[in-house]
C-alpha cells in the first residue's frame, strides 16, 4: 500500500523544490544596473525603504533630488531597480532623436512589461491614423462627441434634482469611453455595452497584471504569467474585442459600393485605408482589434483623470464656476447652445483652467520618458547605454518662468492672462501646447499625437457639466482633496464624492 503514496510524495517534493529554487533564483537574478550618479535617499542605507518611498511618494523623492542636486542627474531606487532622472534642460538633448532612437512607446511598454501585457506593439498605421486622420477630422467630431456625452449623462447619471453624490471615477469612465468610441469604432458600436466594458477593463488588467508579473524576475516570467489572473484576462480581452468587432466589419463589407457616398469616418476606416495604401498584408481583423484596444487604453484613462482633477479644483474653488459658465454660454449663443468647432477655440478661460489644473495635478511628476534604443551621449558627456530608460524631472514648480506669477498659487486664469498680454501670445500657452516649460504632453516632434483630441474631449465634457450642473464637495470635505501617488503617477482621491445638482 505504501507504494501507492510514492507518486504523491515525489510530486509534492518536486513541487516544493521547484518553488524553493524559483524563489531563490528570483532574488539572486534580480541584479539591477547601477549608474555613476548620486542616489536620492542613499543615506538611509535600506533599499526596501527606498523602493517603498518611490511607490508611495515619488513626488517627494524627486523634489528631494532637485533640492540636493539641482541641475545634476540623479537616480532613484524603484521596485524595478535604479531609474535615472534628468533635469528639464536635457529634454533639449533628447527631443531631436527619432522614436526609433529614443522611444517613449518602448519606455511605456517596459514599465508595464508590454511583451506580456501586449502593449509593446508600435504601429505606423495606428500612429498615422491618430497623428494625421484624427487630428484632421477633429472639427467634424465636436457635435458627435457632445451628443454621446449628453446621452451618457441622460442615461448613466441620476436625475440630480437635488444635491446628489457622484462617484466621478466610475461615471466618467463610461462618459469618456463612449465619447472616445464614437470616434474609434463609430456609431452604433460606440454604445455596445460589451465593447465599452472590454475596452475599459483591458487597461486595468494591463496595469494590475503588469505590476503583479513584475514581482518575478524576467527569466521566470514566461512561466509566471500563467499564474497571474490578469494575464489570462488580457488574452481574453483581445479575443473578445475581435469577436465584437467582426459583425461591424462584416456589415461594412456587405454595404453596397456607392461612389457618391463618403466612407465611414472613424478610426476603423482610417486604419483600413492606411493598410491598403501601404500594402501591409499583415494587417488583418485581429490586428485591427488589437490596435483598437491599445488606442482606447491610451485615450480613456488619462482623459478621465484630467477631468476629475479639474472638477475637484472647481468644487474646491467655486469662484471660477460663474466666469467659466458665462464664457461657455457666450461662445455658444449663436447656435442655441450646440457646440461647434469654433466654440472650443473661443473658450480660452476654460482652456486656461484646464492647463492650471494639469500644472498642479499632472498625469505624472516625471515626464518625457524615453528608452534609449541606441547609445546616447548628453551635452554634459553623460552616456546613456542602449536599453536604458530615462525621464525628465519636470514637475518642479520652482522652475516656473518668473513672468508666470506665483508658481505655487492656483490661478485658474493664469494662462488666459498670459495669452492676452500681446498679439504674439494669443496662440501660446494653450492646454495642448507642449513646450519646454509645459511638458505634460511631451516635447519636440514626438509629443503626444492625441493631445488635441484629448483637449477637445476634456473641454466638451467640462462645458457640458458647467452648462447643466452645479457642483460642490460634501460638507465634510475641507479644501481640495490631497492627491495620491502611485510611483510617479498623480491620482485623484477616489474616496471623495462630488455633489451634482441640475441647473433649473
UniProtKB/Swiss-Prot annotation:
Location, primary (coarse class): membrane
Enzyme Commission designation: 1.-.-.-
Transmembrane segments: 4-24
Cofactor: heme
Pfam families, alphabetized: p450 (PF00067)
Residues holding heme: 448
Subcellular location: Membrane
Similarity annotation: Belongs to the cytochrome P450 family.
Protein name: Cytochrome P450 monooxygenase braC
Amino acid at each position: 500500500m505504501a507504494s501507492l503514496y510514492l507518486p504523491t510524495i515525489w510530486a509534492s517534493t518536486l513541487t516544493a523544490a521547484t518553488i524553493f529554487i524559483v524563489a531563490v533564483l528570483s532574488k539572486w537574478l534580480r541584479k539591477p544596473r547601477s549608474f555613476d550618479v548620486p542616489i536620492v535617499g542613499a543615506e538611509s542605507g535600506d533599499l526596501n525603504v527606498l523602493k517603498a518611498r518611490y511607490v508611495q511618494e515619488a513626488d517627494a523623492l524627486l523634489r528631494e533630488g532637485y533640492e540636493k542636486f539641482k541641475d545634476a542627474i540623479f537616480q532613484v531606487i524603484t521596485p524595478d531597480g535604479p531609474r535615472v532622472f534628468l533635469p528639464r534642460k536635457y529634454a533639449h538633448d533628447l527631443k531631436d532623436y527619432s522614436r526609433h532612437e529614443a522611444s517613449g512607446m518602448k519606455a511605456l511598454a517596459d514599465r508595464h512589461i508590454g511583451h506580456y501585457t501586449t502593449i509593446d506593439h508600435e504601429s505606423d498605421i495606428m500612429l498615422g491614423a491618430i497623428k494625421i486622420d484624427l487630428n484632421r477630422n477633429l472639427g467634424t467630431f465636436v457635435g458627435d462627441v457632445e451628443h454621446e456625452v449628453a446621452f451618457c449623462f441622460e442615461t448613466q447619471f441620476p436625475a440630480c434634482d437635488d444635491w446628489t453624490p457622484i462617484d466621478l471615477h466610475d461615471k466618467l469612465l463610461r462618459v469618456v469611453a463612449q465619447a472616445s468610441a464614437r470616434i474609434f469604432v463609430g456609431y452604433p458600436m460606440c454604445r455596445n455595452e460589451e465593447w465599452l466594458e472590454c475596452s475599459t477593463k483591458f487597461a486595468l488588467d494591463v496595469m494590475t497584471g503588469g505590476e503583479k508579473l513584475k514581482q518575478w524576475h524576467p527569466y521566470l516570467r514566461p512561466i509566471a504569467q500563467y499564474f497571474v489572473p490578469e494575464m489570462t484576462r488580457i488574452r481574453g480581452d483581445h479575443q473578445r474585442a475581435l469577436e465584437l468587432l467582426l459583425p461591424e466589419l462584416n456589415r461594412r463589407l456587405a454595404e453596397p459600393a456607392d461612389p457618391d457616398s463618403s466612407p465611414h469616418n472613424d478610426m476603423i476606416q482610417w486604419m483600413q485605408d492606411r493598410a491598403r495604401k501601404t500594402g501591409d498584408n499583415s494587417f488583418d481583423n485581429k490586428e485591427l482589434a488589437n490596435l483598437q484596444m491599445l488606442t482606447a487604453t491610451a485615450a480613456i484613462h488619462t482623459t478621465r483623470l484630467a477631468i476629475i482633477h479639474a472638477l475637484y479644483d472647481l468644487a474646491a474653488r467655486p469662484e471660477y464656476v460663474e466666469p467659466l459658465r458665462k464664457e461657455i454660454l457666450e461662445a455658444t449663443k449663436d447656435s442655441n447652445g450646440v457646440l461647434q468647432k469654433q466654440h472650443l477655440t473661443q473658450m480660452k478661460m476654460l482652456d486656461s483652467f484646464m492647463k492650471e489644473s494639469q500644472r498642479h495635478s499632472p498625469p505624472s511628476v516625471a515626464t518625457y520618458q524615453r528608452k534609449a534604443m541606441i547609445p546616447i551621449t548628453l551635452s554634459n558627456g553623460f552616456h546613456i547605454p542602449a536599453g536604458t530608460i530615462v525621464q525628465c524631472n519636470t514637475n518642479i514648480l520652482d522652475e516656473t518662468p518668473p513672468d508666470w506669477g506665483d508658481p505655487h498659487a492656483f490661478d485658474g486664469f493664469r494662462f488666459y492672462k498670459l495669452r492676452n498680454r500681446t498679439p504674439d501670445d494669443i496662440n501660446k500657452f494653450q492646454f495642448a501646447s507642449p513646450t519646454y516649460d509645459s511638458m505634460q504632453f511631451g516635447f519636440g516632434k514626438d509629443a503626444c499625437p492625441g493631445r488635441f483630441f484629448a483637449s477637445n474631449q476634456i473641454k466638451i465634457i467640462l462645458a457640458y457639466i458647467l452648462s447643466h450642473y452645479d457642483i460642490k464637495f460634501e460638507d465634510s470635505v475641507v479644501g481640495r482633496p490631497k492627491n495620491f501617488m502611485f510611483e510617479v503617477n498623480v491620482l485623484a482621491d477616489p474616496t471623495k464624492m462630488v455633489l451634482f445638482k441640475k441647473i433649473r
